[in-house]
């Protein structure tokens, strides 16, 4: 099936729809008066959540290796001509599984989906062939001493299930962003894509070629 793209505004893409913008493919998760929440359709890179030891904040996204990587991605987009205003700030709640809030909420223009966000939108999110990080810590240093894995971070496995892993494991990075609903994006034109020469019987195709060359 041929893939023909057409331009539409992001506001006209349905939730769960796949679109292309900034040279990347995304899935639209939700929309409100602020903009459209989107997730990368694919993993952009694989890396540890955190390298080295940090007993105070071992699984805090703000102090992770992932945030500098995402910052570089944002800088590359703007360097290539995309206005910074295209990336609407979004708030990421770093509350852990037990309800501890010591990492707080921080505002970024590009980040990771939280466990709560994944729980809300998982039906819309395409599975990928490698595990990928979420923003949510499993536990934090100030959680109950009876809580295990207080240095772990939640991630999504290839089958779509959630689990927790040590922060220095190497998993996928699948960014979440918020774009304006007025952003022009590209989507597949399903109506046009239905036509393909591969679906035309060979005899009909040869007859058409003959009629055009003899006319």
Model-derived regions, located:
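Residue-level detector of alpha-helical secondary structure
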Residues: 206, 210-213
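Collagenous Gly-X-Y triple-helix signature in extracellular proteins
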Residues: 1-196, 205
């Amino acid at each position: 099936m041929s893939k023909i793209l057409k331009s539409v505004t992001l506001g006209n893409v349905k939730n769960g729809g796949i679109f292309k913008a900034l040279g990347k493919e995304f899935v639209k998760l939700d929309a409100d008066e602020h903009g459209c929440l989107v997730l990368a359709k694919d993993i952009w890179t694989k890396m540890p959540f955190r390298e080295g030891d940090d007993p105070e904040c071992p699984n805090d996204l703000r102090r992770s290796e992932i945030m500098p990587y995402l910052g570089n991605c944002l800088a590359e987009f703007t360097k290539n001509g995309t206005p910074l205003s295209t990336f609407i700030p979004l708030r990421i709640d770093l509350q852990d599984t037990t309800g501890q809030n010591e990492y707080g909420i921080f505002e970024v223009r590009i980040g990771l989906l939280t466990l709560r966000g994944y729980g809300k939108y998982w039906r819309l999110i395409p599975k990928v062939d490698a595990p990928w990080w979420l923003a949510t810590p499993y536990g934090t240093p100030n959680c109950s001493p009876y809580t295990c894995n207080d240095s772990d971070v939640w991630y999504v496995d290839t089958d779509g299930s959630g689990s927790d892993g040590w922060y220095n494991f190497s998993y996928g990075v699948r960014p979440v962003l918020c774009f304006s609903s007025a952003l022009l994006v590209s989507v597949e034109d399903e109506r046009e894509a239905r036509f393909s020469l591969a679906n035309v019987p060979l005899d009909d195709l040869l007859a058409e070629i003959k009629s055009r060359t003899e006319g």
